């Protein structure tokens, strides 16, 4: 079946807070966020911020209690992650980190497919320089 997956920035903090609650993550007013929907139904959120070292994904999560099939779940999260990285890169920030330890525990393969790898200090990070110039190389 065909469906429409959309990933869009969340403009209003009140909406971000409500989506965080639905996804079981702590709302952080200092973070920016993207939301994912499939056919208009909310599927997930990515909260992130800019730091002095680079962009930082704080939370990547799907709606709690939702029965998404694995493909829809993975695709929603993958596109959320990549859209966030693209925004970070477009802001001229060419380093990114993945700091959602709880998500990482059960989803290392997905985090790797988004583009992150463990660094020497144990933190998962990546260099965004030219990453989106040839995105098919990173799929």
Annotated model-derived regions:
Residues 114-139:
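C-terminal "cap" of GNAT-fold acetyltransferases
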């Amino acid at each position: 079946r065909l469906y429409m997956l959309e990933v869009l920035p969340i403009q209003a903090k009140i909406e971000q807070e409500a989506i965080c609650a639905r996804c079981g993550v702590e709302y952080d007013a200092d973070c920016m966020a993207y939301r994912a929907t499939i056919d208009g139904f909310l599927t997930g959120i990515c909260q992130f911020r800019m730091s002095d070292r680079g962009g930082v994904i704080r939370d990547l999560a799907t709606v709690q209690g939702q029965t998404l099939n694995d493909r829809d779940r993975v695709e929603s999260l993958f596109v959320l992650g990549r859209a966030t990285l693209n925004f970070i890169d477009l802001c001229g920030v060419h380093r990114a980190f993945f700091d959602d330890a709880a998500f990482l525990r059960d989803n290392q393969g997905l985090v790797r497919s988004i583009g992150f790898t463990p660094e020497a200090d144990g933190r998962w990070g990546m260099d965004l320089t030219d990453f989106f110039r040839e995105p098919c190389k990173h799929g």
